[in-house]
Design a protein with these regions (language model features):
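Metal-cofactor-binding active-site regions of metalloenzymes
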Residues: 1-149, 159-163, 169, 174, ...
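Glycine-rich beta-to-alpha transition loops that act as phosphate-gripper elements at the mouths
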Residues: 154-158
Length: 212
């Protein structure tokens, strides 16, 4: 921790390590439900009426099992409660963890496609942008798209514009971050041509030292 009590890291690898350690706190179902409620309470205070939340099931268990379904049911139950109480719509994007590899990604994609009735609207990829070739995950994204899910992947934050070019080839409808697209005029043009939205998060970019 730093002097103000915040988590402290020196690089992206350390950030990912700390992130995964912290997620262990939420392997308890009561803690996980409390986390979902905390997030949605903050949204209500900000007068947000539509929210999409990333859920990474491989952080709950290293393989698909009934635990995945239980945790999704918890999140979906809370989302329905807040919709009835506050009129706020909450949906989920199931994400694979890139550095766990393509086979794990396919597990997450199949899970997302199976539970579209549980407020799941999309499939995405987070994690270490430097691991594996982006196109190694094509099968997972194709499966999700064929199931009618929206798709997104992190690119263009830790890695440069080339990583965004690879994300475009996946056929995603959004790119998480994507800020380093500005390093290539061609990348910007291609994003525009394909009508791909950038999910920009300045807080992450600053926290990870990408920008001062």
């Amino acid at each position: 921790f730093d002097k103000s009590g915040h988590y402290k890291w020196q690089n992206f690898d350390q950030f990912l390590t700390i992130y995964e350690i912290v997620t262990n706190i939420f392997l308890d179902e009561k803690n996980f439900e409390a986390l979902v409620r905390h997030v949605l309470d903050k949204q209500v205070k900000e007068n947000v009426i539509y929210t999409e939340i990333f859920l990474g099931p491989h952080l709950w268990s290293d393989r698909p099992n009934e635990r995945w379904e239980r945790f999704l049911n918890i999140a979906s139950k809370v989302a329905d409660e807040y919709e009835k109480k506050y009129g706020m719509y909450t949906y989920f994007i199931i994400v694979c963890i890139r550095h766990l590899g393509p086979e794990k990604a396919l597990e997450a994609s199949r899970f997302a496609s199976k539970f579209k009735d549980k407020n799941v609207v999309g499939f995405g990829m987070a994690g270490d942008e430097t691991k594996f070739n982006t196109l190694d995950f094509m099968r997972s994204f194709d499966f999700a798209k064929q199931s009618g899910l929206g798709t997104t992947t992190h690119a263009g934050e830790i890695c440069g514009a080339k990583s965004v070019d690879e994300a475009i080839k996946l056929g995603v409808t959004r790119v998480g971050h994507g800020v380093r697209s500005c390093e290539s005029e061609e990348t910007i043009i291609n994003l525009s041509k394909e009508n791909i939205l950038l999910e920009v998060c300045p807080g992450s970019n600053i926290a990870l030292g990408l920008y001062p």
